[in-house]
Swiss-Prot record:
Record-given protein name: Laccase-16
NCBIfam families tied to this protein: laccase (TIGR03389)
Source organism superkingdom: Eukaryota
EC number: 1.10.3.2
Transport keyword on record: no
Keyword Glycoprotein: yes
Positions bearing carbohydrate: N39, N80, N116, N300, N331, N389, N406, N449
UniProt gene name: LAC16
Amino acid sequence: MEIPRRFCICVLTFFVFVLLSPTTVHSIIRHYKFNVMTNTTKLCSSKPIVTVNGQFPGPTIVAREGDTILIKVVNHVKYNVSIHWHGIRQLRTGWADGPAYITQCPIQPGQNYLHNFTLTGQRGTLWWHAHILWLRATVHGAIVILPKLGVPYPFPKPYKEKTIVLSEWWKSDVEELINEASRIGTAPSASDAHTINGHSGSISNCPSQSSYGLPVRAGKTYMLRIINAALNEELFFKIAGHVLTVVEVDAVYTKPYKTDTVFIAPGQTTNVLLTANANAGSNYMVAATTFTDAHIPYDNVTATATLHYIGHTSTVSTSKKTVLASLPPQNATWVATKFTRSLRSLNSLEYPARVPTTVEHSLFFTVGLGANPCQSCNNGVRLVAGINNVTFTMPKTALLQAHFFNISGVFTDDFPAKPSNPYDYTAPVKLGVNAATMKGTKLYRLPYNATVQIVLQNTAMILSDNHPFHLHGFNFFEVGRGLGNFNPEKDPKAFNLVDPVERNTVGVPAGGWTAIRFIADNPGVWFMHCHLELHTTWGLKMAFVVDNGHGPDQSLLPPPADLPKC
């Protein structure tokens, strides 16, 4: 029997549609090898640094939503090593998260470990970094997660995409600095320079052989994937003569927001659109400089790069005038506050903001510095930090292993849900007055799928400083923020439960508070800590243990066979 021609065409059209449909495109497995090694750099001065594959910044991981990533990390250096994939949800794969002594024991010298995880429901810019000692000063790089094939951005497709990694640089050996500071109980010296993609720039007191150049074509729109990989510095980022449109933070789309200055804390990522619509006859300064409103030593050196318009050449023309960036003052709290308060989730049909409207676990965490007695330290005290007056003590066995195998004596699950002794948190307190903290490896236990609200209340103990807090294993919604002490009767009435910004790292303002909400839908042990490395070292950290739910799809997977041993 002859098959009608129209029927054949319809069947062929159907199969072509199915084959090209985004839902039928199979995800792939992507393999990477990270050799953690020592090499010599000439930035500022020659010194050995720890890198991945000899690169600073390290290699970029590029994948698509739904892909599975296999990364073999090989340790060729004298230090124990671990690497964290910052912002990856790690659904049921906490063994791959990376923080040393939290989800795994570190990779010892000469050993290796295969990280295996899937990029589920995420697309955008994230990053990876060392998560032990202060190695992330030079051990870090970008993660670029593209949308699934056939799925467009929720904004006009850019002509090209560029990754911008902001970092800090010390002329001295960073590990020696922090070890000496820990010995005497104080803070190490501030960094000597900031860098943009590994270059400090021409006006820095730490000149490199060249500045980073950002070539653009007139009339084209570019997407910049900006990452703050600095250890201890919140930063302003600006490009002279150009407006930036924020479209994503921490790998979550936002409502477009136009600004001339980006404020970005350590651990955060921000995607912006840049249209090259300025006078092509000039070069334009790209600048990254410190923001701080605390009275502490900081790196006041501005990193610079050059945006230049290209035609038939891709090099910077030294004969062109360079338009300088008009940077905010380094204590411009109003600039940082305006930027932070202007961010909103996209909250579209395709990308809804699923904000918890009810709360089962309401937590109140005071975050700040303290001082404990120390006979061998300067002034007889050691600077520390804590949450609810608890300075977190790192275990000698990974917490996730202790949880999974029911190993006793490693941690307790009695982390306080609120301070034991309430006080006027934002009133200045003199050194030695209620400044001491208790030590402990305390976790807070959550049942699977619990809705959680945390109010992070900054304190003025010792001094009031900003604290960018990162939560592993989850995204959360920033539903509110304010100055002064949080008022549980008044402040929740102003919470944004419609389109609050969603992210994995949030700033707690000096002298104020931030409220976040999330759903505990990821079983395992999940670290929460200040992303100022100094404060983390001093103990400004804790962890959640999330129990398994019902059935295998709500349960932590077993550990891999090559999980490092302590």
